[in-house]
Amino acid sequence: VEWTDFERATIQDIFSKMDYEVVGPAALSRCLIVYPWTQRYFGSFGNLYNAAAIMGNPNVAKHGTIILHGLDRGVKNMDNIKETYAELSVLHSEKLHVDPDNFKLISDCLTVVVAAQFGKAFTGEVQAAFQKFMAVVVSALGRQYH
């Protein structure tokens, strides 16, 4: 993947301003609520009965934060994203048996949460850079499935 200077700077800027402990839980909660079939991968998380339960679930919040810290690894290794996520791809495909389409769903939910957080600063150009980064990460996570 080729990154422009603008894309690199934009991705680094977004992640430097993001509160992982707010954005991560919000994105994962949104995914579990909007796409309820994704809940099947989180059976050990306890009560996911309704939106309020999901948003108040400490296990969802913790895993949402873990997801953001995982994305931070990609930000720090933008020239080596496939290798950065090789082990996570194996884990999600071979051990957890996660449908790789779900990576795109969480990516879309994260984009919505980030856009809401950044407001007018999340311009079309910024969104394009963010979604390009997320598409590369989604591809890397799904790599083991191919």
Curated annotation (Swiss-Prot):
Record carries keyword Metal-binding: yes
GO molecular function: haptoglobin binding; heme binding; metal ion binding; organic acid binding; oxygen binding; oxygen carrier activity; peroxidase activity
GO BP field: hydrogen peroxide catabolic process
SUPFAM superfamilies: Globin-like (SSF46458)
Record bears the keyword Cytoplasm: no
Protein keywords: Heme, Iron, Metal-binding, Oxygen transport, Transport
Annotated Pfam families: Globin
Domain of life where this protein originates: Eukaryota
Binding-site residues for heme b, renumbered to this chain: H63, H92
Record-annotated Globin domain positions: 2-146
One GO cellular component term: haptoglobin-hemoglobin complex
Expressed in which tissues: Red blood cells.
Family matches, as InterPro entries: Globin (IPR000971), Globin-like_sf (IPR009050), Globin/Proto (IPR012292), Hemoglobin_b (IPR002337), Hemoglobin_oxygen_transport (IPR050056)
Cited function: Involved in oxygen transport from gills to the various peripheral tissues.
Miscellaneous field: Hb3 displays pronounced Bohr and root effects, accompanied by strong organophosphate regulation.
Subunit annotation: Hb3 is a heterotetramer of two alpha-2 chains and two beta-2 chains.
Protein family: Belongs to the globin family.
Protein name per the record: Hemoglobin subunit beta-2
Species whose genome carries this gene: Anarhichas minor
